[in-house]
C-alpha cells in the first residue's frame, strides 16, 4: 500500500467538501492550546515528558514510517535497509535540511541513534549494535548484525527521530512539518518550509502553560484557545465545540522505591494501581487498563508521593490519588519537588512512591512493553516477555504499576480538521466551519 503524504491527505479530504472549496489551498491558520504540562523543552528522544510525546513528532522525523498495514516504508531514508555481509546498510535522502537550516548527513543519523539509545530509544534499540558511518559515503551508515526488516520497524518508532548533531531540547530542531521555538512557559510551532515530508498546512501552533486543569478548560470556554484539554469548558460546555478523541500518547505510572522497604518489592506497584477506581480518574483523561485484577491499598506506613512541581497536571493528579491509595495509618502525602531533585530521586530510587509518565510510541504491544520495561531498566527491554496479551503482563514483576493510559481528548473548535489523528502537520483550517 502506498502511504499518503501530507499533500495527498489534503487532496483526499478536499474531495469530501463543497465544490467551491475544492480550489482552495488551506495553508493558513493558527491553532491555540493551553496545557497543564511541564514546558522544559522538546526532545524527540524523551520517554518521560508528555509535552515531547505530544509535539516532538511534529518537529522531527524517523528514518522510516509505518503504512496502514503496519509495514515500514522510507521517510528520511532513501530506501528500506539493505542487507549486507555484516548486517544492514541505510542511506539517507540527499539534501535534507533541518528547520534551522542544517544539512543532514549520516553523521547526524549516527549521533541521533546513539543519543536515543542512551535515552528513550533504549526501549526499541537495545537489541541493536551501535551504528557506524560510512567513511566513503556521507549519506550512508551501517548497523552490524542487524536484520533489515527488524531494523526498519525499530527505526519507524518516533523515539528514533533524526536530529542534527549538537541538538538541544531548549532549541529543538529537525526535519518535521513545524519549526519549534520554546519560551519560559510557551511553545510556538511555525510552518517549516523545508520539511522533509511536506510543510504543515497551518501557519502556526501556539501553546501556553496552564496553571491547572481548570485553567486549561476555562481558556477554551472563554475562546482564548481552540482545544479544550480533557473537557469542553469549565462551567458550561461550548455549544459549537466538537468532541476531540485522539490517540493514546502514554501511561501515567506509579513507582515504588527503596524507602517503601517491603512495599517496594517488584509487583507491589501493579497491585496498588489495579485497585484504583476508574471513575475517580475520568477528569484527568485517564483510562484504566482492562484485566488489571484485584488491587490493594498502600500498607507501608506514612509516605510521600513524589511529583515534579513544574508539572501542574501531575501535581493535581497526585493529590487526587492520595485518598485512593491511603489506608488508616498508611497515609500517602503528595510532595511536589523541583524537577532536578525529582529526577535524582528517581534515578537512585530514594522514595516511597513516585508519580511518572512513560511515552507510548505506537500501538505495538511488544514495543509498548519494551517502553515500560526500559523505564525501570533499559536492559530489561532487550528481552521482553513473549506472548504478551497486554502491557499489563510486562508490569506484574516490576517496581512500576500503570495508573492508566492517557490520550488526546476533550473538545475542539470545529474549523480545525484532522485533529483527532493528532498528525499536526496534516491539520488544516476549514473557514467554512467557523
Roles of regions detected by a PLM:
Residues 34-85, 91, 114, 173-174:
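N-terminal lobe/hinge region of extracytoplasmic solute-binding protein
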Residues 55, 79-121, 140, 262-264:
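Aromatic- and charge-enriched surface segment that lines or borders ligand/interaction sites
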Residues 82-85, 121-166:
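Surface-exposed binding/hinge segments that line
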Residues 105-112, 140, 204, 222, ...:
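Alpha-helical secondary-structure segments
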Residues 184, 273-296, 312-322, 346-434:
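Detector for C-terminal structural segments
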Amino acid at each position: 500500500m502506498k502511504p499518503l503524504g501530507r499533500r495527498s491527505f489534503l487532496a483526499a479530504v478536499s474531495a469530501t467538501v463543497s465544490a467551491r472549496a475544492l480550489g482552495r489551498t488551506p495553508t493558513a491558520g493558527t491553532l491555540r492550546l493551553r496545557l497543564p504540562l511541564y514546558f522544559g523543552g522538546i526532545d524527540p528522544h524523551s520517554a518521560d515528558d508528555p509535552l515531547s510525546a505530544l509535539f516532538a513528532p511534529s518537529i522531527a522525523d524517523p528514518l522510516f514510517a509505518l503504512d496502514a498495514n503496519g509495514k515500514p516504508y522510507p521517510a528520511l531514508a532513501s530506501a528500506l535497509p539493505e542487507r549486507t555481509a555484516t548486517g544492514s546498510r541505510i542511506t539517507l535522502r540527499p539534501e535534507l535540511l533541518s528547520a534551522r537550516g542544517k544539512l543532514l548527513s549520516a553523521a547526524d543519523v549516527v549521533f541521533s541513534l546513539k543519543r536515543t539509545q542512551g535515552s528513550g530509544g533504549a526501549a526499541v534499540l537495545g537489541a541493536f549494535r551501535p551504528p557506524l558511518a560510512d567513511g566513503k559515503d556521507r549519506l550512508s551508515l551501517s548497523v552490524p548484525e542487524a536484520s533489515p526488516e527488524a531494523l526498519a520497524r525499530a527505526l519507524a518508532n518516533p523515539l528514533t527521530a533524526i536530529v542534527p548533531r549538537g541538538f538541544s531540547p531548549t532549541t529543538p530542531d529537525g526535519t518535521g512539518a513545524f519549526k519549534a521555538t520554546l519560551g519560559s512557559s510557551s511553545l510556538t510551532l511555525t510552518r517549516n518550509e523545508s520539511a522533509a515530508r511536506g510543510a504543515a498546512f497551518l501557519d502556526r501552533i501556539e501553546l501556553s502553560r496552564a496553571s491547572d486543569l481548570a485553567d486549561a478548560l476555562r481558556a477554551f470556554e472563554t475562546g482564548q484557545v481552540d482545544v479544550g484539554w480533557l473537557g469542553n469548558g469549565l462551567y458550561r460546555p461550548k455549544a459549537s465545540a466538537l468532541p476531540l478523541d485522539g490517540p493514546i500518547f502514554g501511561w501515567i505510572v506509579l513507582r515504588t522505591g527503596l524507602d517503601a522497604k517491603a512495599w517496594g518489592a517488584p509487583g507491589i506497584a501493579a497491585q496498588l494501581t489495579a485497585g484504583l477506581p476508574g471513575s475517580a480518574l475520568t477528569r484527568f483523561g485517564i483510562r484504566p487498563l482492562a484485566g488489571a485484577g484485584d488491587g490493594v491499598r498502600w500498607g507501608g506506613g506514612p509516605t510521600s508521593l513524589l511529583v515534579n512541581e513544574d508539572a501542574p497536571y501531575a501535581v493535581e493528579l497526585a493529590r487526587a490519588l492520595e485518598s485512593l491509595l491511603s489506608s488508616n495509618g498508611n497515609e500517602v502525602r503528595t510532595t511536589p519537588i523541583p524537577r532536578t531533585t525529582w529526577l535524582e530521586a528517581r534515578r537512585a530510587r530514594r522514595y516511597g512512591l513516585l508519580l511518572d509518565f512513560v511515552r507510548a510510541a505506537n500501538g505495538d504491544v511488544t514495543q509498548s512493553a519494551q517502553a515500560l520495561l526500559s523505564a525501570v531498566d533499559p536492559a530489561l527491554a532487550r528481552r521482553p516477555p513473549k506472548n504478551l496479551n497486554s502491557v499489563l503482563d510486562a508490569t506484574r514483576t516490576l517496581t512500576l504499576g500503570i495508573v492508566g493510559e492517557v490520550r488526546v481528548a476533550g473538545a475542539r473548535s470545529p474549523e480545525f480538521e484532522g485533529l483527532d489523528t493528532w498528525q499536526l502537520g496534516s491539520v488544516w483550517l476549514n473557514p467554512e466551519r467557523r
